[in-house]
Amino acid sequence: MTNLTFYGAVNEIGGNKILLEDNGTKLFLDFGMSFGTANKYFSEFLQPRKCSGLGDFIEFGLLPDLQGVYRSDFIKHMGRPKEDLNIQGLLVSHAHADHASYINHLHEDLPIYCSDETYCILKALNDTSSSGFNDITDLSVCFETHVKDGKVIRTKGEKLDRKYKPFKFKEKFHIDEIEVEPYRVDHSLSGATGYIIHTSSGTIVYTGDFRFHGRREKETATFMEACKEAKPDVLIIEGTRVDSTNSKKELEVEDEICDISSKAKGLSICNWSVRDTDRMLSFLNAAKKLGKKLAISLKQAYLLDELAKCGDSIAPKTGDEDLTLYANRKSWGVIGDSNWCDKIRDEDYDSWERPYLDRAVCYKDIRANQKDYLMFCSNFDLKELIDIKPAEGSVYIKSVCEPFDAEMEMDWGRIMNWINHFGMNVESTHVSGHASGPQLKEFVEQVNAKNIIPLHTENAKAFENWSKNVTLLGKVGESYVL
């Protein structure tokens, strides 16, 4: 018998956590954060307590209270008896937080299966993040003590490598008796994967997040054809944009960026999702066409160098002559000041940032040559504008999704205050990382699964317009038996 239990993404977008059980083998499909549930109780300044281990997360339903799943140091600190690992693997569809950010809570010996690119992205996040994505690819054991001079004192715990098992697309592998076929799909970051999973009771397709309008749309079409040939018993499909008919292409965004920046009389300030290398390529190609340079953050440079190790064919390379690195002012803020030696400058930056500094530009370079640059500027980087002082005719190119909750509305209102303060125009161009309604309809009809379980959507009922075999989940924790 094969059983699926849905611990997240039920009647909401994100938070995928699906437990698959088949003849004694247990696998999780993704282990992400539910933004909706998390934002009900926590914020940037009100975070779950580390001292409670998993307790705060379990209290508010952010994590299921399961045995043999979570890291040993947290379990011990919570006063629970030792729990041996009783789950055989985690399949990660991609590296977005709503699918992967709670990996840091999982058992240190759990095998984690993902694409090479997904591992590289998670490693970059782990290495460069000050919070949130720590303990994703390695784990620092917490709450350790030792005895010195007859006294118990705290000690720094051992650092353990997590048990990642990166795979190649289209190469089948087994977890016990379960056979897994991973396929690349088009999404708004590299390495996104859809799975065809063969169990003792039948075949399951898990789409993860996907689309047909990016630079890898042919890969999604290949996955769809493979799913059709597999004749699945169950299709677990995302439905983020089930109500949308907009299927604008990524290449159209590239053209619009080029048009917007060509009209700018000053600096082109650009905001897109930091890990979306498809969008980064759109900005880079636009810069090339205009004879400009694209300035990206040091975090993005580190990510690109990690992706280069696994042979990502689409992500830009940090050696590209039209790509430059921008170093923010930090701590003492002496970068660009010749009165200070490199050693003092370097102390402002983390060890992973320092190798990039000698080839990075700073605010002085951008300020003096504003027409020559498209510059990445996340919400956290807005402070750089104080020193850059955007010239008259500068433009802010917004290339992210529209605000969809009150907190995002407040954030955008604050950003607009900065934009207005510096007298910049705002232009928008964006396409989603998710399939539109017509694209979802085509996928459902082509695959023709015996049963369909919509997930990662606020309107699962819409799928009933396309199939009579739809199972609607009512609440988190519900199960489905094949």
List the model feature ranges, each with a label.
Residues 214-299, 391-467:
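Cap/insert and terminal regions of metallo-dependent hydrolase folds
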Residues 246-392:
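Hard-cation-handling environments
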Residues 89-99, 187, 456:
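Histidine-centered divalent metal-coordination motifs
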Residues 13-15, 473-482:
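Binuclear metal-dependent phosphoesterase catalytic core
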Residues 2-12, 16-89, 102-278, 282, ...:
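His/Asp/Glu-rich metal-coordinating catalytic cores
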Residues 7, 30, 115, 183, ...:
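Generic beta-strand/beta-sheet core signal
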Residues 96-98, 379-382, 456-461:
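Short, polar loop motifs at secondary-structure junctions
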Residues 163-169, 325-329, 354-358, 471-474:
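Short acidic-hydrophobic, aromatic-tinged amphipathic segments that line or gate anion-handling sites
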